């Protein structure tokens, strides 16, 4: 079994189940289109590797935390551009979590705390948002144009100690893109809602 340090991006499409209920024929086709025209090309540009898909989500391994962050931002911006003039059934809105940590590889399977932390950060993000662990912020705070806003320690599922999460703020791809507002959520997510309204300003 191989073990190494990697940057892991976890992403999930917001509202996929509702879209499936509304149109179970068009929704999978739309997701495949988004995968082939947005997700796969951006991940390839930033040298990532999708190692798991979950129907409406995916996990990506990057060798570089900078590549992982830039890839995540690029996907969110491309998705925002895609969503212009689209009805809700065709929009692609993602939540994302990003972490750097040890991973273990068993064949094509990738697991470990490096993966788990990214996966548990993702549901806490606002729609269209990116949350990163302190490991990412420590590496990149002075190396990127993106800004990091601390949300303080977060108690993640199955983690022995809290993880400090940071909200990523980046410049818009161009003016006038759609803004999304987070869903109603429990106290932890209300903290994110107050601070994440203009995340990536899309």
Tell where the protein language model's regions lie, with residue ranges:
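Acidic, proline/glycine-rich low-complexity intrinsically disordered segments
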Residues: 183-202
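Catalytic NTP-binding/metal-coordinating core of nucleotidyl cyclase/transferase enzymes
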Residues: 1-73, 77-78, 196, 202
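Catalytic beta-strand-to-alpha-helix segment of the class III nucleotidyl cyclase homology domain
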Residues: 59-169
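Short, flexible hinge/linker loops that cap or flank conserved catalytic cores
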Residues: 1-2, 52, 88-90, 188-191
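Structured core elements
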Residues: 10, 97, 131, 196-197
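Structural motif
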Residues: 6, 48, 91-95, 163, ...
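Juxtacatalytic C-terminal regulatory tail of Ser/Thr protein kinases
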Residues: 169-189
């Amino acid at each position: 079994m191989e073990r190494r340090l990697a940057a892991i991006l976890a992403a999930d499409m917001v509202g996929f189940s509702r879209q499936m209920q509304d149109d179970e024929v068009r929704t999978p086709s739309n997701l495949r289109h988004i995968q082939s025209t947005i997700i796969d090309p951006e991940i390839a540009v930033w040298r990532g590797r999708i190692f798991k898909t979950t129907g409406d989500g995916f996990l990506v391994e990057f060798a570089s935390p900078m590549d992982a962050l830039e890839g995540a931002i690029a996907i969110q911006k491309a998705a925002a551009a895609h969503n212009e003039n689209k009805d809700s059934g065709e929009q692609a809105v993602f939540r994302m979590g990003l972490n750097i940590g040890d991973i273990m590889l068993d064949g094509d399977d990738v697991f470990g705390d490096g993966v788990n932390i990214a996966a548990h950060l993702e549901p806490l993000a606002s729609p269209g948002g990116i949350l990163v662990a302190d490991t990412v912020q420590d590496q990149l705070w002075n190396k990127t144009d993106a800004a990091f806003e601390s949300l303080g320690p977060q108690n993640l599922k199955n983690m022995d100690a809290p993880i400090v999460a940071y909200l990523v703020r980046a410049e818009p791809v161009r003016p006038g893109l759609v803004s999304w507002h987070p869903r109603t959520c429990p106290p932890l997510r209300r903290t994110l809602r107050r601070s994440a309204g203009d995340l990536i300003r899309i």
